[in-house]
Amino acid sequence: IQPAPADVPDIIKNILVPINAQKGDLLPVSAFKGMEDGTMPLGTSQYEKRGIATHLPVWDSSECIQCNMCSFVCPHAVIRPYLLDEKEAANAPADMVLVDAKGPKMDGLKYTMGVSTLDCTSCGSCVSSCPKSGKALKMVPTHEVSLDQTGWKYLQTLPEKNDRIDKFTLKGSQLRQPLVEFNGACAGCGETPYIKLLTQLYGDKMYLANATGCTQAWGAAMPCVPYCKNKEGKGVAWSNSLFENNAEFSYGMCLAVKQLRAAVTEFVKQLDGMTKDAAVKAAIAKWFETYDDLDASSVATDELLAVLESTKFSAEEQAVVAEILKRRKDMSKKTMWMYGGDGWAYDIGYGGLDHVFAMGEDVNVLLVDTEVYSNTGGQSSKATPVGAVAQFQASGKKTRKKDLGLLLMTYDNVYVAQCSMGANPNQLIKAIKEAEAHKGPSIVICYAPCINHGIKKGMNNVQQEMKDAVASGYWNLYRYDPATKKFTLDSKEPTMPLYDFMKGEVRYASLELSFPENAKVLFADAEEAAKEKYEYYKLKSEG
């Protein structure tokens, strides 16, 4: 076994390196000391550095418009934009390309694009999604690119410029650190960009219950954990239970977090009634004012903790302060999310999902819909559309896709959105923001192309496939807000023939070869289903 560098954590030296060398069976039980309860350190994927790319993206700063779309769509968080102030730019490696940052609030800042070359999978999604594809970014054979990581390592030390950006924009979101990186998903994966975006918006305040399936396989393949922490040591509190109980598992997490916060709140109230210190009372007042505001609550909590740690109290007051400080991690508002695929949400875990939503708690779901059981090889699910070929549906699925969004709208308190990243990134960000802000259950259903679809143009065109799915009426974009009872249809009337979209994927095109008569009937039904669905949504949006 090739030894690990001396400056890496013990888990890398003692566990990751031996396992990746196919020597995991030789590990003694003592190697797992401290992990008896199943917990694992975050961020171990950054040490793998597999170096599997045959081609790498090379950035041309003179052609770049700094839209950050390349970073937005990257399935493995390999390509990222950075902002540098004058001092940081002066200390940067001499060969690092820096240009003036464009946009509001960017005065005095430099902009660069970093690529973690040893973590890239050569999918090419960045290049195919670039508005100036072939100019601002090009895929170049790996042997022609420097693999030196000095520049990348320097960029990881830089603080974020959060006061200069709006994280709820495509460009701004990508100037925040992704808290899931270098995962084990397929090259070009359609699932991972969604969860990466979610971590960039809320990752340092997020609890995540992950259903079994592909999202668990690439998110927790022992010993590689792609979920990581920011420079403050905060990251996604991630866990997985089973396929069939993820919603219930998340509900339990939600109730536990709620109870823990209620406990510390009682101590804060008690201190407020005891102390006469004006600074302490002001900090407590602000903490209560921002109690339900995710971002403001975090700031107010830090300010209150700073005041508590710097103020002299009486012995009686200090006893209460000690109880508060002991529970400091429970003080700020957290956001609760479930994450999984259609095999979980439409099928195996649907009963639990329905039950949890009926309870009315403030839980959120990010559902990546690949329309098959992806992790186990492409078996048909209730999300599989009519006419698609999948395992157990070799002659084409005879029934139409279950409309999970409409089913959940029958509850009067559930926020529902349907999104497709490549079709409308801004609608996706808006939906996630609205879902998190909704005081009750919410679900964001995301179209996620998969290798099981057999995209003829290749997995480097996943984002275009998302766009074509909407343009053809195969997939619709909408948002439903139960607070206002408003249904907003965000996709326009189809401009692309549905058949043109379907024939571009092997899961449909193969049916014409193996069962041509079935294809004729089922594709006609698919056309009718798409037309009916759009007309129904259109009527619903018109009130």
Segments and roles (model prediction):
Residues 1-120, 127-336, 388, 451, ...:
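Ferredoxin-type iron-sulfur electron-transfer modules and their immediate structural context
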Residues 218-219, 317-442, 455-472:
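Thiamine diphosphate
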Residues 69, 125, 196-200, 263-266, ...:
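Alpha-helical scaffold segments in soluble metabolic enzymes
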Residues 75, 207-211, 367, 418, ...:
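A structural signal for short, well-ordered beta-strand segments and their strand-loop junctions
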Residues 521-526, 531-543:
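C-terminal, charge/polar-rich interaction regions
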Residues 84, 142, 368-371, 421, ...:
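Short, ordered loop/turn segments at secondary-structure junctions
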Residues 1-4, 223-236, 428-518, 525, ...:
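Glycine/aspartate-rich loop-and-adjacent alpha/beta segment that forms the canonical ThDP
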